[in-house]
Curated annotation (Swiss-Prot):
Gene name linked to the record: rpoA
One Gene Ontology cellular component: cytoplasm
Record bears the keyword Transferase: yes
Assigned keywords, A-Z: DNA-directed RNA polymerase, Nucleotidyltransferase, Transcription, Transferase
Protein name in UniProt: DNA-directed RNA polymerase subunit alpha
Top enzyme class: transferase
Record-linked SUPFAM superfamilies: C-terminal domain of RNA polymerase alpha subunit, Insert subdomain of RNA polymerase alpha subunit, RBP11-like subunits of RNA polymerase
Oligomeric form and interacting partners: Homodimer. The RNAP catalytic core consists of 2 alpha, 1 beta, 1 beta' and 1 omega subunit. When a sigma factor is associated with the core the holoenzyme is formed, which can initiate transcription.
């Protein structure tokens, strides 16, 4: 284990030197229930890693509402038929499973479906309350072949994933009460593709394109956000160090950096190839201090600056105990002060 003065050192370069996505762009074609999102640039392979993980969580782990039990007036069990109703009870139950709902509470809610007139009975006949709203009002529940009273009492709950009828807590099968298999997930479909992304002259980075379709109870961007939070919380247990230690080490290194005499060197003093030197000059980088404050991403975006030049410069910085992405407060001011001292000494 790497230590300094008996203290453990955290090598933050393992994650700070990776290219990070700049923004999650939402496509203009997105709607309240469909979202197309583009995330770039990502290190090669990270598109598949993140896309697959997000897809699994989106489909399996988000909370949603579903009907878990139904009591149809005059019906004893799900294999019954109802006079004056074209569909049998089994068909009605299958139709109820298609109803999508939005709930504003974690407490179970009771709803009622009422109809009297001949014709189609759709989910819009379900009487919601201030805690529950019906999203899929066009779903056909049953068809009345004559005028008659038709009533279904429903129980709605929040949950996640798929729960079989016999697994609902606190509900037991009894005469007249029909338990339903419930699919709680508010996310209906997730697809992702990986394309090439460009960083400077390099094209071997990933672009993650994520398409999410929901039932309307949650916005696609919120679904992604919640899923990312779930993944973040689950991965925390694998981090075996306090990130404050990492910050402390970063501060110690910053103190070392500010004492480093190489900071004020001109890039002309470095043993770099002509191509690398010219690239730095074209980016208006004159000193080592200016150079090391650039991130890998910023460097690779520089015109005509490729991976080979980047690796060459990175090795030179390492030889001086420096690296990309470091920060020095008021570097320009310190550089000017150093120049004045140098001119005074030379005079």
């Amino acid at each position: 284990m790497l230590t300094r003065n008996g203290q453990r050192l955290i090598n933050s370069r393992n994650w700070t030197e990776l290219v990070k996505p700049e923004v999650l762009d939402k496509d203009p074609s997105s709607t309240e229930t469909f979202g197309r999102f583009v995330c770039e640039p990502l290190e090669r392979g990270f598109g598949t890693t993140l896309g697959n993980a997000l897809r699994r969580v989106l489909l399996s782990s988000l909370q949603g509402a579903a009907i878990v039990a139904a009591r149809i007036e005059g019906v004893q069990h799900e294999f019954s038929t109802i006079p004056g109703v074209i569909e049998d009870v089994t068909e009605i139950i299958l139709n109820l499973k298609q109803v999508r709902l939005a709930m504003a509470t974690d407490e179970p809610q009771r709803l009622t479906l009422l109809a009297k007139e001949k014709g189609e009975v759709r989910a819009s006949a379900i009487q919601g309350n201030h805690n529950v709203s019906v999203l899929s009002e066009d779903v056909l529940i049953a068809t009345l072949s004559e005028d008659r009273d038709f009533r279904i009492d429903l129980e709605v709950r929040m949950g996640k994933g798929y729960v079989p009828a016999d697994m609902h807590e606190g509900l037991e099968s009894e005469i007249g009460l029909i338990l339903l298999d419930a699919s709680f997930s508010p996310v209906k479909k997730v697809a992702y593709t990986i394309e090439q992304a460009r960083v400077g002259q390099m094209t071997n980075y990933d672009k993650l394109v994520l398409e999410v379709t929901t039932d309307g109870s949650i916005a696609p961007e919120d679904a992604i956000s919640y899923s990312a939070k779930i993944l973040k919380d689950q991965l925390t247990v694998f981090i075996n160090f306090d990130e404050k230690e990492s910050e402390a080490e970063k501060n110690r290194r910053r103190d070392d950096i500010e004492l480093n005499p190489s900071l004020f060197k001109s890039i002309d003093e470095l043993e770099l190839s002509v191509r690398a030197t010219n690239c730095l000059k074209s980016a208006n980088i004159q000193t080592v201090g200016e150079l090391m404050q650039k991130t890998e991403h910023e460097m690779l975006k520089t015109k005509n600056f490729g991976k080979k030049s980047f690796e060459e410069i990175r090795r030179v910085l390492e030889d001086m105990g420096l690296e990309f992405g470091m920060r020095i407060e008021n570097f320009d001011q310190k550089y000017q002060e150093w120049l004045k001292r140098k001119q005074t000494d030379e005079a």
